[in-house]
Amino acid sequence: MYKIATMCRVLEVSTSGYYAWCKRSPSARAQADAELTSRMSAIHDRSYGTYGAPRIHAELEAAGIRVGRKRVARLMRTAGLAGVSRRKWITTTVRDRNARPAPDLVERNFMVPGPNRLWVADITYIPTWAGFLYLAVVLDAFSRRIVGWAMATHLRTELVLEALNMALAQRRPAGVIHHSDQGTQYTSIAFGMRCRESGVRPSMGSVGDCFDNAMCESFFATLECELLDRRHFRTQVEARMAVFEFIEGWYNPHRRHSGLDYLSPINYERGHYSEESTASPPPST
């Protein structure tokens, strides 16, 4: 350890100036940065370490804290805070070449004016030490909310039927389009019958084309980078609980989405219904 006088001489500063600097109170800017960093660290922890600068900035703005995104990014770098990056998911789709797919009613246009107009669906896999689980989801294209999902150790039609039935029970839509690829589960007779009896309009893109089902791919990429890449499941029960907590406890109610003005899916839907009720004229008397 060097003496202070020696270090001051090497750095060409006076010892009196050094001691004065030590006694000086932190500047208002430094104090504000320290307080802001503390808030950002708490937000980062609540996001399970997944949020980067854009979503942390959105959280601060929602809390009434006006701050630039560049400043947030700078303070995050200084504090060693970083979000996670997504990677491409692997498709599990197998096409039945003898089945007749439904027509493509979407044609890569996923813009809809409200909830329950268009649902998109797909399947991915969940690795565990006890073997693979498969996750089928139904996602509302308007809000990116997962409205139905199911997990199983198989890829039979029952898996996607369970996810569809959950979505139907929760949302009770009228004439919703259900868009998927041409996987055997979606082209099956049982799935087609369930769609007809519930008033769902099936739509299918091509097999394994990310552009035909970009929204599901985006959700699966988020699931993988924010959960599956960061945890290793010993049992299938552990994996099921983790996926449940991710979808129902984090993604739907809380996770801010860049395509939804950095609102969560549930809050985005609430805003839509609130605007609808405000815009509706009062009943005539």
Predicted regions and their residues:
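Charged DNA-binding/catalytic regions of mobile-element recombinases
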Residues: 1-285
